[in-house]
A protein has these predicted regions:
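Conserved nucleotide-binding/hydrolysis micro-motifs of P-loop NTPases
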Residues: 72-73, 114-118, 136-141
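AAA+/SF3 P-loop NTPase mechanochemical coupling elements
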Residues: 55-62, 93-113
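Substrate-gripping "pore-loop 1 plus following alpha2 helix"
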Residues: 39-53, 80-99, 142-148
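Phosphate-sensing "switch" segment of ASCE/P-loop ATPases
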Residues: 103-108, 122-168
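Conserved AAA+/SF3 P-loop NTPase catalytic/coupling segment centered on the Walker-B
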Residues: 62-88, 101, 119-126
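Helical mechanochemical/support elements of P-loop NTPase systems and associated helical scaffolds
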Residues: 21, 25, 56, 67, ...
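P-loop NTPase catalytic core of nucleic-acid-dependent motor ATPases
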Residues: 1-62, 131-134, 160-164, 168
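Short beta-strand segments
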Residues: 13-16, 67-68, 110-113
Length: 168
């Protein structure tokens, strides 16, 4: 997410039951990236009656990381839209009350959810983009560190160094 490169053409799905660190992970990365991180509604990624590009995507133009929280169980992904978003396609949209513009999404998309959304298509084009990252461990109330987010935020400079090494 640091580079602005989407050459991997991926949608990263953080999947697992609750109380396992998905939100903590996303929140820390959001803090690390600051203004380069944007949150999107789950409705941005799910299939609706219309497949048009709306103002929700225009808001994501400058984002290096796009975080989406929770889809409803059984909701289907908007597969064509996800292919466009992750593929670097030139999209046309307009901000609310604004003029039309052309843009590409340069951010990596992370969906944190308890249940895998429905993917109806069987073609390689969508399935090669889906990168599921399992969060298999569930922490009981006694095991949870309620201050973990604060502790990790205090270590952002070290986390940034680690992330930069990963980019090189």
């Amino acid at each position: 997410s640091l580079t602005g490169s989407t050459s991997e053409q991926c949608l990263f799905i953080l999947i697992g039951d609750g109380a396992n660190g998905k939100s903590t992970f996303i929140n820390v990365i959001n803090k690390l990236l600051g203004d380069y991180s944007k949150a999107a509604s789950s409705q941005t990624l799910v299939a609706k009656g219309s497949s048009s590009i709306g103002d929700d995507l225009v808001d994501l133009v400058s984002a290096r990381l796009i975080s989406v929280s929770e889809t409803e169980a059984g909701e289907a992904l908007a597969e064509a839209k996800i292919k466009q978003m992750t593929g670097g396609d030139v999209l046309k949209g307009r901000p609310l009350y604004g003029s039309w513009l052309e843009f590409s999404i340069i951010g990596k998309i992370f969906l944190a959810t308890n249940s895998l959304p429905q993917i109806n298509n069987t073609d390689h084009g969508i399935w090669r983009r889906i990168q599921a990252i399992p969060f298999n461990r569930t922490f009981t109330a006694e095991q949870q560190d309620k201050d973990l987010g604060i502790k990790l935020t205090a270590e952002l400079s070290g986390i940034l160094n680690w992330a930069i090494k990963g980019c090189l």
